[in-house]
């Protein structure tokens, strides 16, 4: 058991060394206006617009900062979205974030989003204890909403929450493979964000799944066939390991 309730999570090693293969192209998707607000008092619309201008100035002109994501639930959220859209910037693109249910998806459709992030939790901790579902129920529910998004012309960006505590080969890769099938059928991208929700990801050579960052990324690209440009890494609380 890598993640016991009573002790610090363990790191497994299988001595598999993965050669570096940098992303091409390399880009950033910004989450300042979504989870960036969860650690501080919420931004005002004026502050959001100012930060959005700075993001455009910093990397939006070149597309290095490719997109920003926004909540869309409150009147303030929607006003901020309208204000940033009115800037007319090509980058960062304004994208949404929702829970994986049809009511939220309807909000995204009504607000004419062409891409939206969906919370698709993948660890057993989240599936069984937070959602109260089985793996099969969770996957079926996720796929149903993703299919509906594609029907409505919305590119889904599936946020694999808590991926570094998940069963990569038993759940994540089969789920990702189904997403790639849907993408082929719809002739539309289905993007995946790998979310290290608890900060358990490690960059160490020889580290094993599910904690090896390079192992997770390579599994999605090589085993599930996810194109690199559809794949994002979303690190939380990396405790300076990004410097390793």
Predicted regions and their residues:
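Metallocofactor- and cofactor-centric catalytic cores in central/energy metabolism, strongly enriched
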Residues: 38, 67-71
